[in-house]
Amino acid sequence: MGRFLLVTLSLLVGAFSLNEANSCCCPQDWLPKNGFCYKVFNDHKNWNDAEMFCRKFKPGCHLASIHSNADSADLAEYASDYLKSDGNVWIGLNDPRKQRTWVWSDRSSTNYLAWNQGEPNNSKNIEYCVHLWALTGYLKWNDTPCKALYSFICQCRF
């Protein structure tokens, strides 16, 4: 009986420790994924203001970068659930030098792209920032003027 209680108690302590480890990293109402925390904000901002808003949380926070189909699908589902397909969503991809060289605001590698068909097209030579397109269920990207006002997704490590 004593051994059974000791094993049971050890399992309970371990379970609580694991639960705390999983919930300690992201604030409530942020989505944990691959060591990052993500949050959709429905405040409509231009790309630069959205990036600055994300950076204010703590050093290393930026607009979200996406590096795989799985990440894209998870963030698309999260944005769809939160926004109900109501408007486009800024991500951290942009062309700061206006040379059609796309970079993430967190300086991570540009190893995955999910452009909508015919994009990026730099319509009227003023499209240097990227959003998740609501019309595609947030799965595809579009280049658009950075001054457009959209919701946005921040990415942080807490």
From Swiss-Prot:
Motif segment (Mannose-binding)? 119-121
- Give the record's glycosylation annotations as residue positions: N121
Cite the binding residues for Ca(2+).
E127, N142, D143
Ordered alphabetically, the record's keywords are: Calcium, Disulfide bond, Glycoprotein, Hemagglutinin, Lectin, Metal-binding, Secreted, Signal
Report the SUPFAM superfamilies cross-referenced here: C-type lectin-like
List, alphabetically, the Pfam families matched.
Lectin_C
Listed GO CC annotations: extracellular region
Task: Report domain C-type lectin positions.
Answer: 33-155
Disulphide-bonded residues: C26-C37, C54-C154, C129-C146
The stretch of residues making up the signal peptide is: 1-23
Which GO MF term does the entry hold, naming one? carbohydrate binding
Q: In which tissues is it expressed?
A: Expressed by the venom gland.
Where does the protein end up?
Secreted
Family as reported in the entry's similarity comment: Belongs to the true venom lectin family.
Q: What does this protein do?
A: Mannose-binding lectin that binds to and agglutinates erythrocytes in a calcium-dependent manner.
Q: How does it assemble?
A: Homodimer; disulfide-linked.
UniProt xrefs under PANTHER family: MANNOSE, PHOSPHOLIPASE, LECTIN RECEPTOR RELATED (PTHR22803)
Name of the protein: C-type lectin mannose-binding isoform
